[in-house]
Design a protein with these regions (language model features):
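Short catalytic-loop micro-motif centered on adjacent basic/acidic residues
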Residues: 213-217
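Electropositive, gly/pro-rich neighborhoods at or near active sites that engage anionic ligands
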Residues: 1-177
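Conserved nucleotide-cofactor-binding alpha/beta core module
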Residues: 114-115, 161-212
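Short glycine-rich anion-binding loops that position phosphate/pyrophosphate groups of nucleotides
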Residues: 55, 101, 219-221, 245
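A short, acidic, amphipathic alpha-helical segment used as a generic capping/interface helix at domain edges
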Residues: 32-35, 77-84, 196-206, 222-223
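Residue-level detector of flexible, active-site-proximal loop/helix-junction positions
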Residues: 102, 188-190, 246
């Protein structure tokens, strides 16, 4: 499906043909990607799906340091990963990037993705001849099709699952969402610096447990870890980057609600970011689960 950006007026006067080369990309929309991923899971086809969202794409252009402090090591690792994936089979290693126009994201636009900064980064660092996918396609807080989210959860619950995620995630929440899971814990603060030890631990656990699916919610450690595991495990297990979708359920577990500009600690250890209120998203999903 070919997507083009119009005259730029919808982007605050920015010209997509100059700043965002996405008008010429071959893209798969959220619905298309979801169909591919769900079918892969149903048919036990091994694949990986990683999301290069506003975090890493903004970070490499020094525009986004709220999740990690500025560090050339992180920036260079991301750029190296971007180049590596160009050589991977595009059906085996699917790459999701921000594409939050209504046609790509089921009629809804993400309130958080910094799409302009992301596309400037893409133009510099990603192979624009590669096939890309709308990055909200798995189950997303932003594209709040909660029934689709439950469909994804049900598919995953039928598998043997490992979650590589925040050390603060309560196992009760993980088991509620994804079934009886194994949790490889990731540091809450500056997770990137632990990506090599995380990779080694996942390999160890995979050899011992032979998981069907490994889910990643590991902040900046997700990207280098998934790339490394794809190579070291020789594409032998399905890996899916689920972003921060677990977070609203953790907030609900601890009875945390929206705190705009609140005194919260981010993954960089800094204070002052905010937690968005996804109360309705969580409530709707919990109701569907309870009614099943």
């Amino acid at each position: 499906m070919k997507i083009y950006g119009g005259d730029g007026k919808d982007w605050g006067g920015w010209d997509p043909k100059t700043d965002y080369p996405w008008y010429s990309l071959d893209f798969k929309s959220t619905k298309e990607v979801r169909s591919i991923i769900f079918n892969n899971l149903r048919n036990d086809k091994i694949f990986s799906f990683v999301r290069f969202g506003d975090g890493p794409l903004g970070y490499v252009d020094d525009m986004n340091h709220r999740w990690h402090p500025k560090d050339e090591k992180i920036k260079n690792e991301f750029i190296k990963n971007f180049k590596k994936i160009d050589d991977y089979n595009q059906d085996d290693f699917m790459v999701g990037i921000p594409m939050d126009t209504p046609i790509m994201s089921d009629g809804l636009i993400s309130p958080i993705t910094s799409i302009r900064q992301c596309w400037k980064s893409m133009n510099k660092y990603l192979d624009l001849d590669r096939k890309y996918f709308a990055h909200n396609a798995i189950h997303s807080m932003f594209v709040c099709e909660y029934k689709m989210t439950v469909d994804f959860l049900n598919l995953v619950k039928s598998k043997k699952v490992c979650i590589v995620g925040n050390e603060r995630y309560p196992i009760e929440v993980l088991n509620y969402l994804y079934g009886d899971v194994h949790h490889v814990k990731v540091p809450y603060i500056n997770a990137f610096y632990s990506h090599e030890s995380i990779t080694n631990e996942v390999i160890k656990q995979q050899k011992a447990n032979n998981f069907d699916v490994i889910l990643f919610a590991a902040s900046f450690a997700t990207y280098p870890t998934m790339v490394s595991l794809f190579e070291k495990l020789n594409n032998s297990v399905t890996m899916i980057d689920i972003g921060s979708t677990i977070d609203p359920f953790v907030n609900d577990y601890y009875n945390i609600r929206a705190t705009p500009q609140g005194n919260v600690v981010t993954h960089s250890g800094k204070r002052g970011w905010w937690i968005t209120d996804y109360t309705d998203f969580v409530r709707n999903i919990k109701k569907v689960i309870s009614d099943q």
